[in-house]
Amino acid sequence: MLTVLVDYDSGNLHSAEKAFQRMATETGAGQVLVSDRPEDVARADRIVLPGDGAFPACRRALGSYGGLSEAIEEAVTRRARPFLGICIGMQMMATRGLEHEETPGFGWIAGEVVRIAPSDPHLKVPHMGWNDLTVDHPHPVLTGIETGDHAYFVHSYHFQVAHDAERLAHADYGADITAIVGRDTMVGTQFHPEKSQKTGLRLIANFLTWKP
């Protein structure tokens, strides 16, 4: 079994690589490889797409690696490889992003990425730090994760899904903030599982052993 963390120069993958390698060892889930090569994505059994920064910049960066975006599309939509998007990697699952400019996403989960607008003016944007999760819909990747568990967020925009059934969990930050999305063989987290201690490691382990 091979899990590929896609490296397209949009964030430091060191902590994510360590967390995935640790949980792959603990669960017997095989090898974890960080790669920017389309051929590695093509042979992967599972794909993880991280991303830090602004949606348009990450989308352009991914597109600048010849064949990489296409390899992800092929693996996820045509060959149904399990996929996990993290932070901007999750946002790119949307129809479009509205950060700075309108930018098309993969369009795998209907909805758009919009700026967080807390109802409480004392709540600062970006949403940064620990927050509680509220589980909206059960999912194998959420096994052992309950409402009230903590996750670590750093973001100014969030994914407004078109269909409630595809929002698996949310957080409260003066408004409902989408925390986890999912459909078919794909899931995404707005928070960073590799920085979310027990909750994040549980989610990573669940993803690595998920058999959709």
Swiss-Prot record:
The UniProt record lists the keyword Hydrolase: yes
A single cellular component GO annotation: cytoplasm
Entry EC number(s): 4.3.2.10, 3.5.1.2
Keywords: Amino-acid biosynthesis, Cytoplasm, Glutamine amidotransferase, Histidine biosynthesis, Hydrolase, Lyase
Pathway this chain belongs to: Amino-acid biosynthesis; L-histidine biosynthesis; L-histidine from 5-phospho-alpha-D-ribose 1-diphosphate: step 5/9
Catalytic activity field: 5-[(5-phospho-1-deoxy-D-ribulos-1-ylimino)methylamino]-1-(5-phospho-beta-D-ribosyl)imidazole-4-carboxamide + L-glutamine = D-erythro-1-(imidazol-4-yl)glycerol 3-phosphate + 5-amino-1-(5-phospho-beta-D-ribosyl)imidazole-4-carboxamide + L-glutamate + H(+); L-glutamine + H2O = L-glutamate + NH4(+)
Subcellular location: Cytoplasm
Domain of life (superkingdom): Bacteria
Classification via CDD domains: GATase1_IGP_Synthase
Pfam families named among the record's database cross-references: GATase
One annotated GO molecular function: imidazoleglycerol-phosphate synthase activity
Residues forming the catalytic site: 87, 192, 194
Ranges for domain Glutamine amidotransferase type-1: 2-212
A biological-process GO annotation: L-histidine biosynthetic process
UniProt function note: IGPS catalyzes the conversion of PRFAR and glutamine to IGP, AICAR and glutamate. The HisH subunit catalyzes the hydrolysis of glutamine to glutamate and ammonia as part of the synthesis of IGP and AICAR. The resulting ammonia molecule is channeled to the active site of HisF.
Subunit structure: Heterodimer of HisH and HisF.
Xref: PANTHER family: IMIDAZOLE GLYCEROL PHOSPHATE SYNTHASE SUBUNIT HISH (PTHR42701:SF1)
NCBIfam families: IMP_synth_hisH
UniProt-recorded name of the protein: Imidazole glycerol phosphate synthase subunit HisH
Source species: Cereibacter sphaeroides (strain ATCC 17023 / DSM 158 / JCM 6121 / CCUG 31486 / LMG 2827 / NBRC 12203 / NCIMB 8253 / ATH 2.4.1.) (Rhodobacter sphaeroides)
